[in-house]
């Protein structure tokens, strides 16, 4: 059966649909020897689909990992400059997993890795408004008026943010410690939100995605999601099979 190419790549655990579109655009995908184009349809049972020159097959068993990404680690599976990536931290995992979304190089915390492209696409889809919670250490004292601005939504270069939930944990004259929950996944969003209200982020750690928590997982360590966590996450993002 013919399907859109990005959907096939997602089903085969190559990448989320969004990431698959980028791969097609970058010329990394071919169908029957010809470069793929966005919008192309194919049949996995009939066509020879290659990604980076390697023929893809039907998906292996679905795997879901939780990683506590440390700072100074790239949210990619490879790096031409030899820097540490999340792939270096999941040795022993045979499944071809990929990160769902990203944490920037200087941020740490909860990162989901999976070979379930449909699940990844659902988590990243802006329409799902999946909550993501961060611990934030910022410079200076965050005044109530700026908390209110963040909670109402704030204008960034790429548009207004959805309302955030901000909990002040503790503060001094020099720093503020906050728990911030957002429902989007824009690039460096929390850092940019804080900069817009006049505060630089000193430390940023994601501790929760929807109902999945980092818990006591050590920095640089990973674990497999429990069946209960997988079931709950699938239910929240739209009853994915």
Model-derived features with residue positions:
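Basic, flexible Lys/Arg- and Gly-enriched helix-loop patches that mediate nucleic-acid binding at interfaces
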Residues: 1-241
């Amino acid at each position: 059966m013919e399907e859109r190419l990005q959907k096939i790549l997602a089903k085969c655990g190559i990448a989320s649909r969004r990431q698959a579109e980028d791969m097609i655009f970058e010329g990394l995908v071919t169908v029957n020897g010809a470069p793929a184009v966005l919008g192309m349809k194919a049949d996995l049972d009939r066509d020879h689909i290659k990604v980076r020159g390697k023929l893809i097959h039907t998906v292996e068993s679905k795997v879901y990992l939780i990683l506590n990404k440390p700072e100074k680690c790239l949210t990619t599976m490879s790096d031409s400059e030899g820097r540490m990536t999340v792939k270096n931290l999941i040795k022993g995992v045979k499944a071809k997993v990929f990160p769902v979304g990203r944490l920037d190089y200087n941020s740490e915390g909860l990162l989901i890795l999976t070979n379930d492209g449909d699940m990844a696409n659902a988590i990243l889809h802006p329409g799902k408004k999946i909550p993501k919670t961060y611990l934030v250490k910022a410079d200076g004292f965050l005044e109530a008026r700026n908390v209110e601005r963040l909670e109402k939504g704030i204008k960034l270069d790429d548009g207004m943010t959805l309302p955030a939930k901000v909990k002040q944990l503790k503060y001094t004259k020099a720093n503020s410690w906050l728990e911030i929950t957002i429902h989007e996944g824009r690039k460096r969003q929390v850092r940019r939100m804080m900069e817009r209200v006049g505060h630089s982020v000193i430390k940023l750690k994601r501790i929760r995605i929807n109902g999945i928590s980092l818990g006591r997982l050590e920095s640089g360590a990973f674990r497999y999601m429990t069946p209960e966590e997988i079931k709950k996450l699938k239910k929240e993002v739209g009853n994915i099979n």
